[in-house]
Amino acid sequence: MSLTLRVLAPDQSVFDGSADEVILPSTTGQVGILPGHVSLLAALDVGVLRVRTNSNWQSIALMGGFAEVESDDVTVLVNSAELGVNIDSTSAESDLSAARTAVTKLEGQPSTPEKVKAQQLFQRARARAQASKST
């Protein structure tokens, strides 16, 4: 018994296949999905979705969205996503370092659009870096 997983972004189908286990980055924490899971609708945070097929794990960097689990079908609708194997880890680490520097520079300051954008860029860079290493 396995799950059917679909990860869909507005411009592409990122993943469409079978999985034995899926770990979702929900806004309330990690949610593990196995065959027979109860129906679920969850908001997703920027983070890494992990997919296990047999003993192999794949990672997908997600930039927020929603997941629906219904009768062993998992549908993930996201703003954008990237397979970990398609992310250059050196470039992702460089982007993460630059984003971390930008956030650190703005620490202690009141919330401004610039600070919010820097924090969002940091979250995205961290998700991409984690997904690039998890493959």
UniProtKB/Swiss-Prot annotation:
Entry function: Produces ATP from ADP in the presence of a proton gradient across the membrane.
Renumbered residue ranges of the record's region Disordered: 101-122
Keywords (A to Z) from UniProt: ATP synthesis, CF(1), Hydrogen ion transport, Ion transport, Membrane, Thylakoid, Transport
Topological type in the membrane: Peripheral membrane protein
CDD domains reported for this sequence: F1-ATPase_delta
Subcellular location as annotated: Cellular thylakoid membrane
Record's protein name: ATP synthase epsilon chain
Subunit annotation: F-type ATPases have 2 components, CF(1) - the catalytic core - and CF(0) - the membrane proton channel. CF(1) has five subunits: alpha(3), beta(3), gamma(1), delta(1), epsilon(1). CF(0) has three main subunits: a, b and c.
GO cellular component terms given for this protein: plasma membrane-derived thylakoid membrane; proton-transporting ATP synthase complex
Family label: Belongs to the ATPase epsilon chain family.
Top-level taxon: Bacteria
GO molecular function, one term: ATP binding
